[in-house]
């Protein structure tokens, strides 16, 4: 498997610059907010979302030369993503993410809420200054989608008749919406044909769904240390993901366990056993592969380039995280 560092080589310099710029962009006059923001962007990671924005920007520009507006869009994408994580961690009562303390565990819930709101507000300001109404419409809808996803997740906890379609819709709102919108936005800033821009929206959509589905598999198959957060955390809170939905199709014994919210001894352990013994993980892996393959097909209209190849490799890398 190619390392993510090698895959992102075409935008390595741009990502280095982005990392330096992020702390400057979210600087606040208030020392606590500044400290919280710096804490957020000090976390290590390859920042796949802005990397994809930068790769699409290069793949859609002549000679792969991108503009300052493309770079700013990549920064906005990461700021919005980070803001959503701050609020997610509060709602999930998570103390760690990527192996480091969350903002609310270090600074308290009030500061964390304000920090998340502040990041959303900052992203809106920088978004408006891109001076592209179409891009503003695309990206601003993402913030609405985040809220929609959280509402749906809250309303559907321990819902044993949740459909796969409902699960995928929630996954789109919470994960894939930002990737889809920012992918298309990068193309629009390159002034490409609308057909190509829509293809790239669908690339981001299906890649985002594949990424979320893989994450939901890893929640069952990886350790807390590997995940950087507690394993099986979604199931414990009643958030039924694809592995559980497929297991429910094959074994109805799961229904009473989930309906009583794992309140009796061994309920949770028996649920994990059923998920493992059915073909639920295998079927979920196939679902992720389907979305990844569609994502790759959406790149067909792009001209040959190293950035296009990197976009394909990212899609394959998402699946290879399972092995």
Swiss-Prot record:
GO biological process, one term: isoprenoid biosynthetic process
Main localization category: plastid
Superkingdom as given in the UniProt entry: Eukaryota
Enzyme nomenclature, EC number: 2.5.1.-
Pfam family, one: polyprenyl_synt
Cofactor entry: Mg(2+)
Localization (cell): Plastid, Cyanelle
CC per GO annotation: cyanelle
Family matches, as Gene3D superfamilies: Farnesyl Diphosphate Synthase (1.10.600.10)
Chain residues that bind isopentenyl diphosphate: 46, 49, 81, 98
Binding residues for Mg(2+) 2: 88, 92
Keywords noted in UniProt: Cyanelle, Isoprene biosynthesis, Magnesium, Metal-binding, Photosynthesis, Plastid, Transferase
Binding site for Mg(2+) 1: 88, 92
CDD domains: Trans_IPPS_HT
A GO term for molecular function: metal ion binding
Positions that bind an all-trans-polyprenyl diphosphate: 97, 174-175, 212
Record's cofactor remark: Binds 2 Mg(2+) ions per subunit.
Function: Possible role in synthesis of the nonaprenyl side chain of plastoquinone or in synthesis of other prenyl chains such as undekaprenyl pyrophosphate.
PANTHER family, per database record: ALL TRANS-POLYPRENYL-DIPHOSPHATE SYNTHASE PDSS1, GERANYLGERANYL PYROPHOSPHATE SYNTHASE
Family that this chain belongs to: Belongs to the FPP/GGPP synthase family.
Protein name (Swiss-Prot/TrEMBL): Prenyl transferase
Organism: Cyanophora paradoxa
Lineage: Eukaryota, Glaucocystophyceae, Cyanophoraceae, Cyanophora
Name of the encoding gene: preA
């Amino acid at each position: 498997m190619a390392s993510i560092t090698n895959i992102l080589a075409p935008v390595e310099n741009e990502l280095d610059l982005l990392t330096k710029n992020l702390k400057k962009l979210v600087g606040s006059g208030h020392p606590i907010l500044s400290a919280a923001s710096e804490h957020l962007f000090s976390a290590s990671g390859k920042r796949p979302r802005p990397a994809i924005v930068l790769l699409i920007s290069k793949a859609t520009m002549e000679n792969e030369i991108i503009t300052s507006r493309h770079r700013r869009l990549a920064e906005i994408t990461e700021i919005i993503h980070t803001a959503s994580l701050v609020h997610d961690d509060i709602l999930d009562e998570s103390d760690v993410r990527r192996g480091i303390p969350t903002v609310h565990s270090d600074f308290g819930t009030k500061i964390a809420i304000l920090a998340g709101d502040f990041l959303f507000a900052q992203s809106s300001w920088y978004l408006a200054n891109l001076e592209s109404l179409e891009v503003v419409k695309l990206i601003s809808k993402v913030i609405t989608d985040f809220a929609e996803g959280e509402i749906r997740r809250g309303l559907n906890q321990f819902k044993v008749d949740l459909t796969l379609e409902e699960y995928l819709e929630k996954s789109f709102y919470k994960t894939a919406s930002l990737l889809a919108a920012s992918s298309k936005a990068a193309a629009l800033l390159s002034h490409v044909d609308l057909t190509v821009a829509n293809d790239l929206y669908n690339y981001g959509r299906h890649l985002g769904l594949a990424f979320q589905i893989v994450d939901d598999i890893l929640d069952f198959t990886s350790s807390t240390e590997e995940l950087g957060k507690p394993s099986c955390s979604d199931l414990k809170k009643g958030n039924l993901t694809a592995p559980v939905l497929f297991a429910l199709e094959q074994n109805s014994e799961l229904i009473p366990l989930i309906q009583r919210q794992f309140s009796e001894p061994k309920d949770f352990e028996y649920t994990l056993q059923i998920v493992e013994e059915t073909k639920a993980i295998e079927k979920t892996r196939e679902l992720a592969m389907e979305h990844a393959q569609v994502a790759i097909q959406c790149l067909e209209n792009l001209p040959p380039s190293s950035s296009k190849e990197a976009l394909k490799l990212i899609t394959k890398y998402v699946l290879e995280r399972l092995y």
